[in-house]
Amino acid sequence: FGLAFAVALPLFAQQKPAYLDAAKPIEERVEDALKRLTIEEKVAMLHAQSKFSSPGVPRLGIPEFWMTDGPHGIRPEVLWDEWDQAGWTNDSCVAFPALTCLAATWNPDMSMLYGKSIGEEARYRNKTVLLGPGVNIYRTPLNGRNFEYMGEDPYLASRMVVPYVQGVQQNGVAACVKHYALNNQEINRHTTNVIVDDRALYEIYLPAFKAAVQEGKTWSIMGAYN
């Protein structure tokens, strides 16, 4: 029996799909999973099944994933397909200071602790993705969401976003850096045609996203609305 068990172990290891093998590079795992998905399954995973969730693929052991707002607090539970709160009597969350306050500290260690703390709460609530942090640069003072972002300085935002992302993802929760890119106002945000020259784009509006991806290793990015 012992010999048969010893032989079976390497056979099982060989049969284990690459996408389930945590020891393999993420690129290889993703490619392997994509090859196994049907068109219908791919479309379903890219489409929401509720306000804050998308379906998984049970036959491949891929779970559905659940998202929650940040960037400065976990959103209380909402109804399945509505924005109204679900009204759970035991539902509460920590309201963290806005990211503009965090950025004003110029303290990367504080940013790491902030991200770690909010990531812990997201994990406790069984969330897969935290919809934050936001790093859109302050272009106009009339943007009502400026308080959600890390200031008007691309260097400051670049230094503060990295530890935030790392702190969140220490908990196995994906940070979703937003909104890529040039989503710097809320007025007519679904129809605005943003015109920007290359120098402004690469020196002002993209550095924080670049740092989040290359240094912070963020697991997801949210597209802009413009």
Regions found by a protein language model. Give the residues of each.
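Bacterial N-terminal signal peptides
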Residues: F1-P10
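Glycoside hydrolase catalytic-domain context in secreted enzymes
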Residues: A13-N226
